[in-house]
Every structure is written in structure tokens, then in C-alpha cells.
Amino acid sequence: MMSSAPETFSLDHLSQHQQQQPPPLAEQEQLCYVHCNFCDTILAVGVPCSSLFKTVTVRCGHCANLLSVNLRGLLLPAAASTANQLPFGQALLSPTSPHGLLDEVPSFQAPASLMTEQASPNVSSITSSNSSCANNAPATSMASAANKATQREPQQPKNAPSANRTSEKRQRVPSAYNRFIKDEIQRIKASNPDITHREAFSAAAKNWAHFPHIHFGLMPDQGLKKTGIQSQDGAGECMLFKDGLYAAAAAAAAATAASSMGVTPF
């Protein structure tokens, strides 16, 4: 009897101690409303108070779409209006709770001030970048126009030399060789009417090659002797140059000297 009494006392003491301890309270939840952008449905969501400053994932019961909701941003009215979640922010301050959520969270003002301080430099930087872009837009357009103008300018002088060249070709005086060949062909045909033009041209070319004084501008009276040429008519006739040949050679030499000095002979 003496040994069993303390045991019963201890059991009774434990049972009384368990009865005195209150049952664990369920975690308090806040009823919030989330708008589903996919099916345009308002969802009633119970968010634990410990997760009010976190980003939670909500599954829509109507379309099974997953929504990522930032509860920290919804606490600010400005963030709630920008995120189109104003009903959710109003639900946090709804009269269902005995007192507002802002009263339950005394450290709420600190995040708000930090977020406003962080937002103001971002806004100022965005406005400054927009203004700088607006100021630089006319400068870039003017620079591009100047570059296009400089690219088009070099194309104009390219066409000018070609026009000058064509005019020079049109105004060019026949060379001494051409004048000599022309006069020589006429002389050979006059002396031998039966000769062909091809044979006369060949004979004129040989005459030009056999008289170097024509190339160097020498006059025929400087000790050169008369030579004969053989025509290409197959008869093997030998023709001697007359005074007209020397006159033509002298005229060709004079034309060559005048053209080298830049003076038109005729």
C-alpha cells in the first residue's frame, strides 16, 4: 500500500498538469481575395499570418491555373493598385478581423519606407534615361543624314571624269600615223588604181616602218635617201616615192610636233 500510493499520486499529478495546459491553438489565417486573370474568377484564399510577407502560390479551383501572389506588395495601396490586386489589399483590412492587419504588424512602416526610397531612384533614373534618349534622337538623326550626304558626294566626281574623257575623245586630233596612212593609201591608189584597199594599207604601213624620220619629227631634207617598196599585188613591181610622199611626211612630222606642244595644226 505504501509503495503504490506515490505512483497513484504521480499519475494524478500528470493528469492534472495535462488538463491545465491549453490545447495548441490553430494557426490564425487571414481571408483574402485573389483575382484569376485566366478565367476571371475571384478566389477566396486563407493565408496564414506567418506567410503574409511572402510570395505564395495559389491554384485556381475553377481552371486549375497557378497564380504567384506577392503578399508583401499587396500590403501597400500603391502596389495593390498597380498589380490590379486592390480587392486583396482591401480584404486585408476587412472588418472580419477584430482590428486591422496594420495594427498587428508594427514593423510594417519600415518596409514601406524602404520600398518608397528604392522606387524613387528607379523612377528618376527611368525619367532621366527617357529624357536623354529624347535629346539624343535628333542628334542621331542628323548624324545619319550627314553620313548619307557624305556617301553620296563621292559618287558625283566619278561621273565627271567619264564625261571629260568622252569630250576629249571627240575633240582629239588624228595622229600623225593615221594622217600618213590615209594620205599614203590615197597616193598608192592614185598611182595604181587596180590595187585593193588591203594591199594599199599594207604598203602604206610598210612605208611608215621604213622611214624612221617620220617618227622622230625629222625633215626629209636631212640626208635621207629615197627607197623603193614592193607592193602586195603579186606582180613584184617596185615603186619609187615621189615628191608628194616627202611632202606628206613633212606634214605628218609637223602635225606631231604641234600636237606635242599642245597646238592644233589646222
UniProtKB/Swiss-Prot annotation:
Domain of life of the source: Eukaryota
Q: In which tissues is it expressed?
A: Expressed in leaf primordia, young leaves, floret meristems, floral organ primordia, stamens and carpels. Does not show polar expression pattern.
**Would you name any one GO CC term?**
nucleus
The residue ranges flagged as biased composition, category Low complexity, are 119-141
Record region (Disordered)? 1-22, 119-174
Span of zinc fingers (C4-type): 36-63
User: Where's it mainly located?
Assistant: nucleus
**Which Pfam family is one of this chain's hits?**
YABBY
Q: Where in or outside the cell is it found?
A: Nucleus
Keyword entries, A-Z: Differentiation, Metal-binding, Nucleus, Zinc, Zinc-finger
One Gene Ontology BP term is:
regulation of leaf development
One GO molecular-function entry: zinc ion binding
Polar residues compositional bias, start-end: 142-165
Instruction: Please give the InterPro entries that the UniProt record associates with this protein.
Output: HMG_box_dom_sf (IPR036910), YABBY (IPR006780), YABBY_C (IPR056775), YABBY_N (IPR056776)
Q: Relate the induction remark in this record.
A: Repressed by WOX3.
What is the annotated role of this protein in its UniProt record? Answer: May be involved in leaf cell growth and differentiation, rather than abaxial cell fate determination.
**Family label:** Belongs to the YABBY family.
Task: Output this protein's name.
Answer: Protein YABBY 5
Q: What is the lineage of its organism?
A: Eukaryota, Viridiplantae, Streptophyta, Embryophyta, Tracheophyta
Report the gene name.
YAB5
